[in-house]
Amino acid sequence: MRSQFKDEHPFEKRKAEAMRIRYKFADRIPVICEKVEKSDIPEVDKRKYLVPCDLTVGQFVYVIRKRIKIPSEKAIFIFIDDILPPTAALMSKVYEEHKDEDGFLYVLYSGENTFGDIPGVEEIE
């Protein structure tokens, strides 16, 4: 899926900004968070985040939930490179494994599991 942030900012500018952020804030990760295009969930009010390295994916999801003001009973899923990362994973580990060549970590969020079933989870009737 194409990133709106990438469309609006040239590669060299994004790369320079990510490098500047990593140099100035060594304990933080530059993250771009955007809504999956066809999701019915609200748009987040800002898409650029400086995330502490020791934050978990679950804690980051909580931050996004608060920013888009959705009720706790509504599901939210985040995707990085079309995968659903484990909620206990540290953002620093996810960043090292999935950062873009421009230095940002691109996160998509949706109100539904857009990319299909979660492996290993079976439905019961």
From Swiss-Prot:
Site feature Cleavage, where: G116, D117
Positions annotated as propeptide: 117-125
Keyword Nuclease found: no
Membrane topology according to the record: Lipid-anchor
Chief location: membrane
Subcellular location: Cytoplasmic vesicle, Autophagosome membrane; Vacuole membrane
Family matches, as Gene3D superfamilies: Phosphatidylinositol 3-kinase Catalytic Subunit, Chain A, domain 1
Keywords attached to this entry: Autophagy, Cytoplasmic vesicle, Lipoprotein, Membrane, Protein transport, Transport, Ubl conjugation pathway, Vacuole
Effect of G116A: No cleaving of the nine last C-terminal residues by ATG4. Defect in micropexophagy
GO biological processes: autophagy; protein transport
GO cellular-component term (any): autophagosome membrane
Post-translational modification: The last C-terminal 9 residues are removed to expose Gly-116 at the C-terminus. The C-terminal Gly is then amidated with phosphatidylethanolamine by an activating system similar to that for ubiquitine.
InterPro entries, alphabetized: Atg8-like, Ubiquitin-like_domsf
Function (record text): Ubiquitin-like modifier involved in autophagosome formation. With ATG4, mediates the delivery of the autophagosomes to the vacuole via the microtubule cytoskeleton. Required for selective autophagic degradation of the nucleus (nucleophagy) as well as for mitophagy which contributes to regulate mitochondrial quantity and quality by eliminating the mitochondria to a basal level to fulfill cellular energy requirements and preventing excess ROS production. Participates also in membrane fusion events that take place in the early secretory pathway.
Subunit-level organization: Interacts with ATG4. Interacts with ATG30 and ATG32.
Name of the protein: Autophagy-related protein 8
Organism: Komagataella pastoris
